[in-house]
Amino acid sequence: MSKTVRGSCLCGAVSYAAERISDIVECHCAMCRKAAGGHAGFFFVAMRNEVSWEGEGKLTHYESSPGLIRSFCSRCGTAMTGANLKEPDDTIILSANALEGDVPARVIAQEFCASKATWFAGHDEAPEFDGPYPGWETLKP
């Protein structure tokens, strides 16, 4: 997608701007549900060199799994990224939960549906996968 999108945390201390983004994947794994504070985490991929941050120093980084880092606002706790490689590549997974306004993207898949919260009945027409979304490696802006 070629429209610059913006996202920010609840308190406004941290924000990102991404020049291009992929479509969105909805993750139902327990870690993403807890990090997002809801029934699922929503994430998209951007090129690392096309993302700019304001308040980046206010991010706290947490190794949620071996080799995977999540980042959130140290002031309000809003998740700003998904689980990114500790040794980063040219892409970054950002939290769509933090997006502002209209965006040129849509949910294209739901992953880890076997881990869905029992209280969540579902809502999307996006395909469901019991494990990880098999298209992550080809998902690009």
Language model features: what each stretch is:
Residues 1-8, 13-141:
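A short Gly-Trp-Pro
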